[in-house]
Amino acid sequence: MNQISWTKKAIKQLLSIDQRYVKSIREKVNALNTFPDVKLDLKKMSGKDSQYRLRVGDYRVLFEVIDGEPRIINIQTVKRRTSTTY
Protein backbone atom coordinates (compact mmCIF):
# COMPACT_ATOMS: atom_id res chain seq x y z
CA MET A 1 0.00 0.00 0.00
CA ASN A 2 1.35 3.40 -1.01
CA GLN A 3 1.48 6.65 0.93
CA ILE A 4 -0.08 9.50 -1.08
CA SER A 5 1.38 12.97 -0.57
CA TRP A 6 0.07 16.32 -1.79
CA THR A 7 1.97 19.45 -2.74
CA LYS A 8 0.87 22.73 -1.15
CA LYS A 9 -0.30 23.91 -4.57
CA ALA A 10 -2.51 20.83 -5.06
CA ILE A 11 -4.08 21.26 -1.60
CA LYS A 12 -4.82 24.90 -2.35
CA GLN A 13 -6.39 23.94 -5.68
CA LEU A 14 -8.51 21.23 -4.04
CA LEU A 15 -9.82 23.71 -1.46
CA SER A 16 -10.89 26.10 -4.23
CA ILE A 17 -12.98 23.46 -6.06
CA ASP A 18 -16.75 23.27 -5.64
CA GLN A 19 -17.42 20.90 -2.72
CA ARG A 20 -19.74 18.77 -4.89
CA TYR A 21 -16.67 17.47 -6.74
CA VAL A 22 -14.13 17.30 -3.90
CA LYS A 23 -15.51 14.01 -2.52
CA SER A 24 -15.21 12.31 -5.90
CA ILE A 25 -11.67 13.61 -6.39
CA ARG A 26 -10.62 12.42 -2.92
CA GLU A 27 -12.11 8.95 -3.49
CA LYS A 28 -10.25 8.52 -6.77
CA VAL A 29 -6.99 9.83 -5.31
CA ASN A 30 -7.31 7.47 -2.32
CA ALA A 31 -7.67 4.58 -4.77
CA LEU A 32 -4.09 5.35 -5.87
CA ASN A 33 -2.97 3.56 -2.68
CA THR A 34 -2.71 0.40 -4.76
CA PHE A 35 -0.84 2.03 -7.66
CA PRO A 36 0.06 0.60 -10.20
CA ASP A 37 -2.61 -2.12 -9.69
CA VAL A 38 -5.47 0.34 -9.87
CA LYS A 39 -8.46 0.36 -12.21
CA LEU A 40 -8.92 4.08 -12.82
CA ASP A 41 -8.83 6.33 -15.88
CA LEU A 42 -5.05 6.87 -15.77
CA LYS A 43 -2.80 7.98 -18.58
CA LYS A 44 0.97 8.29 -18.55
CA MET A 45 2.05 11.78 -19.61
CA SER A 46 4.07 11.80 -22.80
CA GLY A 47 7.60 13.09 -22.42
CA LYS A 48 7.48 12.64 -18.64
CA ASP A 49 9.07 9.58 -17.08
CA SER A 50 7.06 9.37 -13.90
CA GLN A 51 4.04 11.66 -14.37
CA TYR A 52 0.46 10.49 -14.83
CA ARG A 53 -2.97 12.02 -15.32
CA LEU A 54 -6.07 10.84 -13.45
CA ARG A 55 -9.38 11.93 -14.94
CA VAL A 56 -12.20 12.77 -12.51
CA GLY A 57 -15.14 14.32 -14.37
CA ASP A 58 -14.16 17.81 -15.52
CA TYR A 59 -10.96 17.70 -13.47
CA ARG A 60 -7.53 16.26 -14.14
CA VAL A 61 -5.34 15.27 -11.20
CA LEU A 62 -1.69 15.25 -12.20
CA PHE A 63 0.65 13.17 -10.11
CA GLU A 64 4.16 11.84 -10.20
CA VAL A 65 5.51 8.61 -8.78
CA ILE A 66 8.63 8.92 -6.62
CA ASP A 67 10.08 5.69 -5.23
CA GLY A 68 6.78 3.94 -5.95
CA GLU A 69 4.75 6.51 -3.98
CA PRO A 70 2.19 8.75 -5.77
CA ARG A 71 2.58 12.50 -5.12
CA ILE A 72 -0.27 14.79 -6.21
CA ILE A 73 1.22 17.82 -7.92
CA ASN A 74 -1.62 19.61 -9.69
CA ILE A 75 -5.41 19.65 -10.19
CA GLN A 76 -6.67 21.22 -13.41
CA THR A 77 -10.15 22.11 -14.57
CA VAL A 78 -10.99 21.03 -18.10
CA LYS A 79 -13.70 23.06 -19.75
CA ARG A 80 -16.12 21.32 -22.06
CA ARG A 81 -15.81 22.02 -25.76
CA THR A 82 -18.82 23.76 -27.22
CA SER A 83 -19.67 25.27 -30.56
CA THR A 84 -18.37 28.62 -29.27
CA THR A 85 -14.97 27.11 -28.45
CA TYR A 86 -14.00 27.19 -32.09
Predicted segments, located by residue:
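Short amphipathic alpha-helical segments
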Residues: 25-28, 75
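Hydrophobic/aromatic residues within well-ordered alpha-helical segments
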Residues: 17, 21-24
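Enriched for short, Lys/Arg-rich terminal
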Residues: 1-5, 12, 16, 56-59, ...
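A short, surface-exposed loop/turn module that caps and links secondary-structure elements
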Residues: 30-54
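N-terminal alpha-helical segment
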Residues: 6-7, 38
